[in-house]
């Protein structure tokens, strides 16, 4: 069937049929582009979640290290105290003998 026959059978003017055909092709392209964007967006969201989780883990690691820093300082203070007490006991032992 010729386009004019199709247009006449449907009661549509040939120019309307051409305009519909052009718009239909553009709409299909737009629909495909929107679907591609949605897929890209979904992939980006997944990747952002992965990055966020990695950053959280790294932050927890650094926070833990800072907490260990306090414990290290306390341990160093205890080592100094033990060293001073050891020297004091050695001196007392030397004085007693």
UniProtKB/Swiss-Prot annotation:
Q: Does the keyword Transmembrane helix apply?
A: no
- Alphabetically list the UniProt keywords: Coiled coil, Endosome, Transport
Its main localization is other
Q: Where in the cell is it found?
A: Endosome
As recorded in UniProt, coiled-coil segments are: 45-97
UniProt keyword annotation of Magnesium present: no
What's in the GO CC field?
Answer: endosome
Annotated signal peptide: none
Q: What family is this protein classified in?
A: Belongs to the SNAPIN family.
Q: How does it assemble?
A: Component of the biogenesis of lysosome-related organelles complex-1 (BLOC-1).
What is the role of the protein in this entry? Answer: Component of the biogenesis of lysosome-related organelles complex-1 (BLOC-1), a complex involved in endosomal cargo sorting.
* Designated name of the protein: Biogenesis of lysosome-related organelles complex 1 subunit SNN1
Specify the species. Answer: Lachancea thermotolerans (strain ATCC 56472 / CBS 6340 / NRRL Y-8284) (Yeast)
């Amino acid at each position: 069937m010729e386009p004019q026959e199709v247009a006449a059978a449907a009661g549509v003017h040939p120019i309307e049929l051409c305009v519909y055909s052009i718009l239909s092709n553009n709409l299909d392209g737009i629909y495909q582009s929107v679907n591609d964007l949605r897929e890209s967006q979904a992939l980006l969201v997944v990747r952002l979640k992965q990055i966020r989780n990695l950053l959280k883990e790294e932050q927890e690691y650094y926070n833990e290290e800072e907490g260990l820093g306090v414990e290290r300082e306390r341990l160093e203070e205890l080592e100094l105290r033990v060293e001073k007490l050891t020297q004091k006991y050695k001196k007392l032992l030397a004085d007693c003998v």
